[in-house]
Each structure stands twice: as structure tokens, then as C-alpha cells.
Swiss-Prot record:
This is UPF0182 protein MSMEG_1959/MSMEI_1915. Keywords: Cell membrane, Membrane, Transmembrane, Transmembrane helix. It is found in: Cell membrane. Belongs to the UPF0182 family. One of its GO terms (cellular component) is plasma membrane.
Length: 1003
């Protein structure tokens, strides 16, 4: 019986065709409309920032990849179908009137164009959509260069693994998928059109079907052979759980690698066997070849390596893996910037008893002991510096350093007083108010981290609050900028807080003759402002207004009269997100901080270039390696991204006023950065363009440091056998604070310069490391942020059993005097006691000092109204506890008179801290000031003149001699006490008293 005549499709009426056309257009608009709107908005936004070349390069790359892959995959699938159709048998017998294949064949023939063209088009489009997301690999392949370092196994430059190998694997994957889809399409086509018949005892296979299917099957095997070849190189970055390191181990090199070559040879032989069926017309040979390939993959590819691993490697693992562990140690150190050029190890052992004079002489550290914990004092900033309900400080503040009035380096707790739209109330939430009136924050607030205003000897006394330096727009419209650096423009239109709400846009620009944006208040009126920065996308024309109305689903863009021809819209206001948008190849640090640079407020963002296939380098997950108690507390975690290479290659700044993004090359030797600078020329400025003012505020980034300290815990070990046994590993300590739930965070401090190893002050990022699975200290790590030694890591290795952070905190918190005093403050005076960050500080010669500030806040909650103040300072040195209201008191209790001679002075307090408010009003928590004679409320009284917190100072010759006398008198008193000579002891005490008087009177 022949083929049935094809049934014709019923004709559609004109009305039906019109309705279908309208429906298709509506669906396309729903699918493509938002994408087209976003594309146009991005085109405007990138152009406003000056990075339109980034947008066009990425868009063009994605489009080209999409078109090429879609056409290639679609064409291959179409060819498989077309060949099956063109070579179909003329006569196709059927199994009867109910033959299901015949019914399917009839359906396909009736809709031949739909199936013959629609299916390949759909598959091609789907493949193109997936492929365009790999534009990064394609651009790196096109622009990547050499590392100048070769791998230890194949001798290939590391640029091959970073830039070439991922592209080859991508191409091979798509060729394999395309060939497989063509095979399936061809197989189904021949089955439907009669080239393959399964009826009868043996079935039938047409010559055309045999040739086409065998050709495609052979091609798949050839591609598999190429895959085996590439698998060899990928062994160098594999992370099998059986190994304590990343990369190829003994089993991989001596079993898996030869197995890959054997499998490659078998695949080639099988491909020849399969192609031979084109001539021999015997399908048993290719079937045997395919079976051989499958069997070999089980026996050679899996069985042999398993036998080698179990019976050769495991009984002698330390010796067998030693060579490969050495490779991993060297590669990991280079990939994460932990080579000898960067890291200096020094033995740090306390060789004698530390004296008061030695501690006092270590003035770079003792004069800068940090008292303000940026994770605790935010409520105090809010209480005394908020000013208005819609201003806000983040829960965790930042640390930066500036040169103090005395010319010495000093660290500050810094914060920008940003606008928080979520805190607007009642009518303030109206669309006009939210987006055109309340548009910006106002003020840069800094507090010296090493001092507080006043001493709280008694819990009922005022004192212990931060000393605020507020750069704000004052009541007369002029900028008040007392420090820590001059600031010309304190208004903040861009920042992480202001952007942390849905639809964070602001509409700015003058409409008419009046200013609309809220700025500040005088005693009698509210003053408004009009944004004058260059940032913002113009929305004065109806096209842009319509586009943004659609983007934000807000009709007021079309109907509100507050939008005029000079109006602009500010959006995408998060600094880190702006950097990631203009540099999509960067991973940004989770910590973004404000700084005053050249009289402008900028947000500084650290950017990383990363790889995940660096040969033999440890594979690390950023989210787990960077997690600590601070990150967990605010749910600010790094991306869940695996890396085996990382560089802080870019420093970025985002202007807080106009949103300008500037990228600077920090590591110009980074091959990954060089590749991206070739992809996007002109977007990254050279390192030489970093001004000294900006360089003075660049910090060693936290996330990079946390990744490095986690790796240093293992990769400080040189001996591969010791590495394998893990007997000399270290651990990142848990945060000992009772409210913490993760690892102890690193801390920025100003202290003695460990790179230069002298008494000069240095801004550094520090962390302690414990012994493996023990609470004793193993090492102290410091990363320098000073311009001349930036990026240098110093590791002090600590012998013996020195208390780690947990043991130190337990010793302090359980000390009888400490617990009793805090019990009185907390229980009897109804205060909530909070322990601040436990700092570990190298002091004197080989000594380690633990310092923990203690805060008290009214009530028992963490509410913003329960603002904390410093109530005590607790210290531990060896097994001795020092405790008191001030640093000087605690040092004196630990080391004796004179130890706190160079410690931070306390700023005098007259009640609570000065409350700088730009609008001339008192914060809500403060009592209202008395009225003036005319009945108007008086302005807040000016803050009392506070003594400048003392930074590291140069001691005069007279004071140095007095310190020597102090040390001599202390030594004599201790010797007399041990010998029981009370007469000599009394004389020594008198000399000590005289030495103290001499020190106090010395100039």
C-alpha cells in the first residue's frame, strides 16, 4: 500500500488571521518589550556614565555569539532532517490501517514547513540564547595573553589554561550537542519517512539512512577523542575529595592521564571502525567498536585508577603525593598572592618580662588602641548625628585613616549620613515627596577610633560617647567641615543605603524658579536645593519619560508637572553595583566605604579578577572563605563563587554626589586584567593616575585578606609530608564574643609598622590564627595599607602555648574584678553590657596584648534608642588582666606606673557628646534648649572644645630619661620584694615616686 495523500489544512478566514496576528504581536511585545526597554535604558545609563563602549561591546558580543550559534546549531539540525526527507524511500509499506508511524508521517507531511523549519529554528534559538551567556570565555580567548609561567606537568603557559582551554571546551561541547541533535533528528526523520523500518523479523535500514547515521555516530566518537585530549589538561585543576589538595595527584598522573591517552586511542580506533561501515555495509563492526569504547571507559577509565588509588597510593600516600603537594603549595601561593615577595614570616617570642617603660615606648601601638567598635557604635551615630527621621547610618560602620591635627596617622570610624527612603513617614511617602523632594543625604561623620568624649567612671555619669567630627551643610547653607579632612560637597545622592530600596530613583533638576529638594532647616524655614551634578539621565523629552514610566510602572512620569525639560533621573545608585555594571568582569568586595579625597566624598570599591581553573591551585568558595561574624550578622556575604586565582586588580571610586565611576589598575601585572583592558580599552586608568590623596585612603581589602588567611592556615607549610599530615596547620578562630556565631573578623588598626619593624605608625588589617583544632595562638597576620608598603603581609609565628582569642576572652570576662564590676553596671544600673571587638596587638618585645572595649547601653535591647557608650577597657597580657575606665588605667594595672604614659588621652566631656545637626534642630532624644528672649527656640549650643585625641608622638629627651628612671625604679622594687629586703623596697618605692613626678614635669 502506498502513502496516503496528505490532508490539507483548513483555510482560515481573514478575521481569524487578523486575530492571530494581533495575538502574536501581543505575545512578542510581552516577551520582548521589557527587554527592549531595559536595553534602551541601559544605553542611556552607560552613556551618561561615559562607559557606553562597555555596553555596546557586551551587546555586540552577545548578539554575534547568539546569531552564529543559533545559525550553526539550527543549520546542523535542519541538515539532519532535510537529508532524511530528501533521501526517503519512494515506496513505504505500512503495517496496516492502524500503523502509528503512518499517522505521524501524515501529520508531519501535512505540516512539513512547521516541523522541517520550526524545529531547527526553535533548537537554534535555544542554543543561541544559552551560548550568548558565555561571552566572557569568548572575549578572554580572543584577548588573553601569557602568564610567563608554565605548568609543571605539560610545560604549557598558564594563559592556555586561563584563556584557551575554557574556549576549546565550550566549542567542543557545542559541536557535540549539535552533532547529537543532528543524529537524533536524522534518526527520527528516517524512521518517520521510512528509511528505518522496525516491522518484520529483522527490520530494514535504507542505504541513505545507514550512511548518514554512521557518519554522525563516527563524528560523535571523534569529538569524544578530542574531549579525552582536553581532559588531560583539566586534570591539573581537578579537586577529587580523596586528595588533600587541588590538582593532579599520583593517581591522576600515573593512572588517569595514561588512561585518557589509551581511551583517546581506543576512540580513534572505534571511529575508524564506525566509518568502515560506510564501505563494508556491516553494522556489527561499528557496534563492536562502540561496545569496546564503553567497556574500556569502565575498565581503563575508572577501574584502573581505582585500583592504583586503593592499593598503591593509600598505603603510602604521604610519600606518593609529596611531589604533587609541593606543586600545589607553590601554585596556590602564587595564585593567591602569598609568595615570598609578598609574605614575610618572623618568629615572635617573648624573651623576657615586659616592663612599663617598654610598653610606653611602643607609642605607635599604645597611643592608637582602638576603642570604637564600628559594629556597635552605629546607634550612637544615629542618636547624636541623625538629625532627621529619614537620615540613616548602616548597622556596621567603616574604618579609615586620616592625618590628625597633630600630624600623626590616626584611624577613624567613618560613615555617610545617607537618605533612607524606607524611613519616610506619612505624607513623606507620597510619590512627589519620595522621588523629587527627599533625594539625598547630607554629611560625612567621623569619630577618632582611639578616644571617646569623657570618662564614665560611674555608670550614672555621662561620658564614653564617640567624639564626632561632622562635615555637613550648616544652617546658613555653607559647608561646615571640621575634619578629618576638608569637604566641599557633603550632599550624598549615591550610596549603599539610599539604593537599598525598590525603585530607588530620584528625579532632579530645576523646574521653574523654585528649588524642590529638601536640604536643611534654619530656625524659621526649610531650605531646598537643586542638584547641579553631571550625573543623571535626561528625561525632559517625552520618549524618555514614556520609557521610564514603563520601566518603573509609574504613570506620574507622564502626568506630573514636576518633570520639566531640565529634569534628570538618578537610578542604580549602589556604588558596588555601578562598578559591577561598568566592569562586568569584576567581583567586588562586600565592604564599600566612604572617604574624603581631594575635598570630594567618594565611595571606594575593591574589584577582583578571578579564575577557577588555575593548575594545582586550591579551589576556594568565596562565600565560605569570607564569612565571619560581621558578615553573618548583616547577611552581607560574598557570592557563592569558586575561585583558584584572585587579584585585587582594580580600585574603583564612585562619587557620592554625581555618581561618577572611575576605575584604576591596582595590579598592572595581572594577565587577567590585561586581557580585559584589551576587551574594553580606555575604561581602566593606569595605576599612575591614582593620586596621593586617593592612595592615602586605599585599604587592603577585607575579602581578599580573609581568603588569604584561610589559605595561609594550610599553605604556610613548606614540607609536603607535614602538609599531608596536617600536623602544623592553623585555624581561623571563632569570634569569642558571646553574641557572635561565626569566625572572628579581621580588624583595621593603626599600630606599629610590622613591615618596617620599627616604631612608626602603620594602617593595617590584622587577624590572629590558632593552632589546628586548638585554642592556642599560632600566628598573627598583618597586611599593610600604607602606600609605600601596600600589600605586604607579615606573619608573626608564635611558639609555645599562648592564649588564643577564645581563651583570652574567657580569662578577661571571668576575672573576678571584671565580672563583679560589670555585674554592678549591668544588673544594678539596668544597662546592657556589650563586649566590643577583641583586638590582638603585638607590643614591646615579643608580647601580645588583648584589648576588649566594654560598652553599656540603657535597657536590655538592641534598639537604636539604646545607644552604647564605652564604660570600661579590659586587657590581657600573658595571664594577667588589666581593667579600668581608660586605656591608661588598664595598662597601668597590667604593667605598672608609666605604662599608659603614651596611651590615648580622653577628650573632656560636658555632658553628652556634641550633636552636630545641619538643620539647627536638636535630635529627638535630646532635651529641647531653653527659649531665647524673643520666644524662639535657641540653637543647639556649640560643642565644647574637645582635646584632640593623642596619636603617636615623639617623646622628648627629658621624658625618655624619666622613662628610663621609671624602669630602673620598677626593677629595683621587684628585686627588693623578691629578696624580702623591705628597707630597700621602701627606698625603691620612693625612687619610683620621684621618677613619676619627674616624668609628669618633663616637657
Amino acid at each position: 500500500m502506498g502513502m496516503r495523500p496528505t490532508a490539507r489544512m483548513p483555510k482560515l478566514t481573514r478575521r481569524s488571521r487578523v486575530l492571530i496576528a494581533f495575538a502574536l504581536v501581543a505575545v512578542l511585545l510581552l516577551l520582548l518589550g521589557p527587554r527592549l526597554i531595559d536595553t534602551y535604558v541601559d544605553w542611556l545609563w552607560f552613556g551618561e556614565l561615559g562607559y557606553r563602549s562597555v555596553f555596546t561591546t557586551v551587546l555586540a558580543t552577545r548578539l554575534i555569539v547568539f546569531v552564529v550559534v543559533a545559525l550553526a546549531i539550527g543549520a546542523i539540525v535542519f541538515a539532519g532532517l532535510a537529508l532524511a526527507y530528501r533521501t526517503r524511500p519512494v515506496f513505504v509499506p505500512t503495517a496496516g490501517p492502524n500503523d502509528p508511524v503512518a499517522r505521524y508521517r501524515t501529520t508531519v507531511m501535512a505540516r512539513l514547513r512547521l516541523f522541517g523549519i520550526g524545529v531547527p529554528v526553535f533548537i537554534g534559538l535555544l542554543a543561541g540564547i544559552v551560548a550568548q551567556s558565555y561571552w566572557v570565555k569568548i572575549q578572554l580567548f580572543l584577548h588573553g595573553g601569557d602568564f610567563g609561567i608554565t605548568d609543571p606537568e605539560f610545560g604549557k603557559d598558564l594563559g592556555f589554561y586561563a584563556f584557551d582551554l575554557p574556549f576549546y571546551r565550550l566549542v567542543l561541547t557545542y559541536l557535540f550537542v549539535a552533532t547529537f541533535l543532528a543524529f537524533v533528528a536524522n534518526l527520527l526523520g528516517h524512521y518517520l519517512f521510512g528509511g528505518i523500518r522496525l516491522t518484520g523479523r529483522v527490520g530494514a535500514l535504507s542505504r541513505a539512512a545507514r550512511i548518514q547515521l554512521i557518519s554522525l555516530a563516527g563524528t560523535l566518537i571523534v569529538l569524544k577523542a578530542f574531549a579525552y585530549w582536553l581532559d588531560r589538561y583539566e586534570l591539573l585543576s581537578n579537586d577529587r575529595s580523596a586528595k588533600p589538595f587541588t590538582g593532579a595527584g599520583y593517581t591522576d598522573i600515573n593512572a588517569v592521564l595514561p588512561a585518557k591517552l589509551i581511551m583517546l586511542a581506543i576512540a580513534v580506533i572505534c571511529a575508524v571502525a564506525v566509518f568502515s561501515a560506510l564501505v563494508l555495509r556491516d553494522l556489527r563492526i561499528p557496534a563492536i567498536g562502540v561496545a569496546l569504547l564503553l567497556l574500556s571507559s569502565l575498565v581503563v577509565g575508572a577501574g584502573w585508577p581505582l585500583i592504583v588509588e586503593q592499593f598503591s597510593v593509600k598505603p603510602n600516600a604521604a610519600q606518593k603525593e609529596a611531589e604533587y603537594i609541593s606543586r600545589s603549595i607553590e601554585a596556590t601561593r602564587h595564585a593567591y598572592g602569598l609568595t615570598d615577595e609578598t609574605v614575610t614570616y618572623r618568629n615572635y617570642e617573648n624573651t623576657g618580662q615586659t616592663t612599663a617603660a617598654q610598653v610606653a615606648a611602643d607609642r605607635a601601638t599604645t597611643s592608637n588602641i582602638r576603642l570604637l567598635d564600628p559594629t556597635i557604635v552605629s546607634p550612637a551615630f544615629t542618636q547624636f548625628q541623625q538629625g532627621k527621621n529619614f537620615y540613616y547610618f548602616p548597622d556596621q560602620l567603616s574604618i579609615d585613616r586620616y592625618i590628625g591635627p597633630d600630624g600623626n596617622l590616626r584611624d577613624y570610624v567613618v560613615a555617610a549620613r545617607e537618605l533612607n527612603p524606607d524611613r519616610l513617614i506619612d505624607n513623606q511617602r507620597d510619590w512627589i515627596n519620595r522621588h523629587t523632594v527627599y533625594t539625598h543625604g547630607n554629611g560625612f561623620i567621623a569619630s577618632p577610633a582611639n578616644t571617646v568624649r569623657g570618662v564614665a567612671n560611674d555608670p550614672n555619669q555621662n561620658g564614653g560617647y564617640p567624639e564626632f567630627l561632622a562635615s555637613v551643610v550648616g544652617a546658613n547653607g555653607s559647608v561646615i567641615s571640621p575634619g578629618p579632612a576638608p569637604l566641599d560637597q557633603p550632599r550624598i545622592y549615591f550610596g549603599p543605603v539610599i539604593s537599598n530600596t525598590p525603585a530607588d530613583y530620584a528625579i532632579v533638576g530645576k523646574t521653574g524658579d523654585t528649588d524642590r529638594e529638601y536640604d536643611y532647616e534654619t530656625n524659621t524655614e526649610t531650605k531646598n536645593y537643586t542638584y547641579g551634578g553631571k550625573g543623571g539621565v535626561p528625561i525632559g523629552n517625552w520618549l524618555n519619560r514614556s520609557v521610564f514610566a514603563a520601566k518603573f510602572a509609574e504613570r506620574n512620569f507622564l502626568f506630573s508637572n514636576v518633570i520639566g525639560e531640565n529634569s534628570k533621573i538618578l537610578f542604580n545608585r549602589d556604588p558596588a553595583e555601578r562598578v559591577e555594571a561598568v566592569a562586568p568582569w569584576l567581583t567586588t568586595d562586600t565592604s564599600v566605604y566612604p572617604a574624603i579625597v581631594n575635598k570630594r566624598m567618594v565611595w571606594i570599591v575593591d574589584g577582583y579578577t578571578t579564575l577557577d581553573n588555575y593548575p594545582y591551585s586550591e579551589l576556594t568558595t568565596l562565600s565560605s572563605a569570607t564569612a565571619d561574624s560581621n558578615e553573618v550578622a548583616v547577611n552581607r556575604l560574598a557570592p557563592d563563587k569558586k575561585v583558584s586565582y584572585i587579584r585585587n586588580s582594580v580600585k574603583a571610586t564612585v562619587d557620592a554626589y554625581d555618581g561618577t565611576v572611575t576605575l584604576y589598575a591596582q595590579d598592572e601585572n595581572d594577565p587577567v586584567l590585561k586581557a580585559w583592558m584589551d576587551v574594553f580599552p580606555g575604561t581602566v586608568k593606569p595605576k599612575a593616575d591614582i593620586t596621593p590623596e586617593l592612595q592615602a585612603h586605599l585599604r587592603y581589602p577585607e575579602d581578599l585578606f580573609k581568603v588569604q588567611r584561610a589559605l595561609l592556615a594550610k599553605y604556610h607549610v613548606d614540607n609536603p609530608v607535614t602538609f599531608f599530615s596536617a600536623q602544623d596547620f592553623w585555624d581561623v578562630p571563632l569570634d569569642p564574643n558571646p553574641t557572635a556565631s561565626s569566625f572572628q573578623p579581621p580588624y583595621y588598626i593603626v599600630a606599629k609598622d610590622l613591615v618596617k619593624n620599627d616604631n612608626s605608625a602603620s594602617f593595617q588589617l590584622t587577624s590572629a590564627l590558632n593552632r589546628f583544632q586548638r585554642d592556642f595562638l599560632a600566628a598573627y597576620v598583618s597586611a599593610s595599607s600604607d602606600p609605600e608598603t601596600y600589600g605586604k603581609l607579615t606573619v608573626l609565628t608564635i611558639p609555645g602555648q599562648v592564649n588564643g582569642p577564645k581563651l583570652a576572652f574567657n580569662a578577661i570576662s571571668t576575672d573576678t574584678a571584671v565580672s563583679q564590676d560589670l555585674g554592678v553596671i549591668g544588673r544594678d544600673n539596668q544597662n546592657r553590657i556589650r563586649w566590643g571587638n577583641l583586638l590582638t596587638l603585638p607590643v614591646a618585645d615579643g608580647g601580645l596584648l588583648y584589648v576588649a572595649p566594654v560598652y553599656a547601653s540603657p535597657g536590655s535591647s538592641d534598639a537604636a534608642s539604646s545607644y552604647p557608650r564605652l564604660i570600661r577597657v579590659a586587657m590581657l597580657y600573658n595571664d594577667r588582666v588589666g581593667y579600668g575606665p581608660t586605656v591608661s588605667d588598664a595598662l597601668t594595672e597590667l604593667f605598672g606606673p608609666g605604662a599608659g604614659a603614651t596611651a590615648t588621652d580622653v577628650a573632656p566631656a560636658e555632658g553628652r557628646p556634641a550633636q552636630s545637626t545641619p538643620n539647627g534642630q536638636q535630635p529627638a532624644a535630646s532635651p529641647p534648649p531653653a527659649a531665647n528672649a524673643d520666644g524662639r527656640p535657641a540653637q543647639a549650643p556649640p560643642p565644647p572644645s574637645a582635646a584632640t585625641p593623642t596619636g603617636p608622638v615623639q617623646i622628648s629627651q627629658a621624658k625618655a630619661e624619666a622613662l628610663q628612671d621609671l624602669e630602673s625604679a620598677l626593677t629595683a622594687a621587684q628585686e627588693a620584694q623578691r629578696s624580702g629586703d623591705f628597707a630597700e623596697y621602701g627606698q625603691a618605692l620612693q625612687r619610683l615616686n620621684d621618677a613619676m613626678k619627674k616624668y609628669d614635669s618633663a616637657k
